[in-house]
């Protein structure tokens, strides 16, 4: 049986005993000395097994984090520890239908010693002939000397929908065999290399697309004109393919974008 609760002394000892690893080749840094590095799991799942949400993740700098559940099996939390220091813990505010959680496989190490550790929260739903899923990233900030662990950024990093569009042979002919409307959204968070002082700034790049051709959840595919061969391609949605710069705002006690994010409900709402 997998452990669902992790005691603070256990997290403390695992953090202190974490093996030293070289920095990941993909690590990035900005001009202020903030870095993004790999935050891998201490053990990998066997082939064919699902990833264990309770596995410990540790960095080369001896920062470690692990997910835990309460005794009811419903409430989730994250514990973060550094070396022999006192571990920190924060409850995760779960969204509707979120049932899968995992540690983000990257860690941001600030020049001043604090770190940002992420949790990926996933929700999904199924319906006749299709389904939808979405993942958001929640970043938590931890000080090297201990103290409160609190969320500072919450962003969508992935979403997908597959909606049935064929219900008989006529539909299959009209759709040229493309019998589902597909929606994809991907978001990536990286350090802003232009940052010269202070806390890290981030670049968030989002890309959204639909298939076949331009699709919208506001329209009924069964009443749309027949597809053409030229429609059998992915269409990049310019309204939901964008970039934003996030900076820390002390008044909000979190990161805010330089411009509002579009809603992109076709991809993110279900």
Regions found by a protein language model. Give the residues of each.
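Acidic, small-residue rich beta-repeat scaffolds with periodic aromatic anchors
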Residues: 20-50, 57, 134, 142-270
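Hydrophobic beta-strand positions in blades of beta-propellers and related beta-sheet-rich domains
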Residues: 75-82, 137-139, 243-245
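Short N-terminal edge-element motif at the start of the domain
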Residues: 61-125
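Hydrophobic h-region of N-terminal signal peptides that target proteins for export
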Residues: 10-18
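Short consensus segments that form the blades of beta-propeller domains
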Residues: 66-70, 126-132, 232-238
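His-enriched metal-coordination microenvironments in redox/metal-binding proteins
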Residues: 122-135, 183
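Beta-strand-rich domains and repeat architectures in extracellular enzymes and scaffolds
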Residues: 48-68
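Bacterial N-terminal signal peptides that target proteins for export
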Residues: 1-8
